[in-house]
Regions:
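Positively charged n-region of N-terminal signal peptides that target proteins for export
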Residues: 1-4
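Eukaryotic scaffold repeat domains enriched in small/polar residues
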Residues: 23-362
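Bacterial N-terminal signal peptides
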Residues: 6-16
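Cleavable N-terminal signal peptides
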Residues: 11, 21-22
Length: 362
């Protein structure tokens, strides 16, 4: 009898242990929301392509970095040289078209992200040209990081140094490809102005630069362990300089300090493709679960506390309003106002959330 009781107790304990992961997957409440119909007003005969990047500045202006086609291709030696496959548009806070920035810029090839820093400078990340470019608020190029392949073979440079418009390049900081991007994906800044780039599709790492764009360090490699990545795709930094990296190939968000030391990870957010973080004394994290190849019906966006607790979700995959066609970019400067850039539907939606007030709301 004692043996039987012991066996039953062991089975019960095993069942409880096996149930723990499932118990952690609590139901996520739906957040009511609306989508402003046709918010962005495009001029006649100008169209958005894949809305790879979306960002807002302190005035509420919206910037969209979009894959519009029309690229120029030059074959030279063993390399293919391409440019002008993307465009950067600006809209005012009402959605009215303002201008195109950087028309036919050498760096514009295959758009991946646009972000606006605390000084309202506009930064684009281009996966095709392997370049990160900074524009001032007037739309003039003031910095580019990395070097684009030439159309003909040339010797590798001794260093990949940033170049500021109107001034000399920064001092050499290293040699060879170690300092070169390979299909970068996103950019963020800490409180000191240090620059962080997810060097994602090719190198599976995060690179850190000082505020003058001088290389500081890199961390990460291809893999599944903490601190490794499978296509780091989006990056944001909170007011305490914690660094959040979307790691969609590993179905997680990883959190680091600003020196690259791993702190924790969130694994209950599907396939996180895009992140944004709100301003203010109480910050929130938004993450898009964007069309996991194993479940194309996924497509919702999560609202989270910075400790990983999910407050709710909204939307689903689809082509109608309030549905999402592979969200590739998020902006949430205002807590319950989210801009979502979509790939398959060629659009940006302005989303207004109506969450119930909770004890964590401030």
């Amino acid at each position: 009898m004692k043996r039987l009781c012991g066996l039953l107790l062991l089975v019960a304990l095993c069942c409880v242990g096996a149930a723990r992961p499932a118990a952690a997957q609590v139901s996520v409440p739906e957040i009511p929301f609306d989508s402003a119909p046709d918010f962005l007003k495009m001029p006649q005969d100008i169209y958005l392509g894949e809305a790879a990047g979306v960002a807002t500045n302190s005035k509420g202006h919206i910037f969209v970095y979009t894959r519009t086609g029309g690229s120029t291709v030059t074959l030279g030696g063993s390399r293919t040289f391409m440019h002008s496959g993307s465009q950067l548009f600006e809209f005012d806070q009402t959605g009215k078209y303002v201008r195109e920035i950087g028309k036919d810029l050498y760096a514009f090839n295959f758009a991946h992200a646009v972000r606006v820093d605390s000084h309202d400078n506009i930064w684009i990340v281009d996966e095709g040209s392997d370049l990160v470019v900074e524009f001032n608020p007037e739309g003039r190029v003031i910095l580019n990081v990395n070097r684009k392949d030439e159309a003909v073979p040339v010797p590798a440079p001794p260093a990949i140094a940033p170049v500021r418009s109107g001034g000399p390049a920064a001092p050499p900081v290293g040699t060879g490809a170690q300092y070169a991007f390979n299909k970068p994906t996103d950019i963020a800044w800490d409180a000191a102005g240090n620059i962080f780039v997810t060097d994602g599709h090719g190198n599976s790492r995060v690179t850190k630069y000082d505020k003058e764009a001088r290389f500081v360090k890199a961390w990460g490699s291809k893999g599944t362990a903490p601190g490794q990545f499978n296509t780091p795709h989006s990056i944001v930094i909170d007011a305490q300089d914690n660094v959040y990296v979307a790691d969609p190939g590993n179905n997680r968000i990883q959190v680091f300090d600003d020196n690259g030391t791993f702190k924790t990870q969130y694994i209950n957010v599907g396939t996180p493709q895009a992140l944004c973080i709100t301003a203010g004394p109480h910050q929130y994290l938004y993450s898009s679960n964007s069309n996991d190849p194993g479940n194309m019906e996924n497509g919702e966006i999560y609202k989270m506390e910075l400790d990983g607790r999910i407050l709710g979700k909204f939307g689903r995959a689809g082509t109608l309003m309030k549905e999402f066609g592979a969200v590739h970019a998020l902006d949430c400067r205002v807590e319950n106002e989210v801009f979502a850039g979509e790939i398959t539907t060629w659009r940006v939606q302005k989303l207004i959330l109506h969450p119930p007030r909770t004890s964590s709301s401030r």
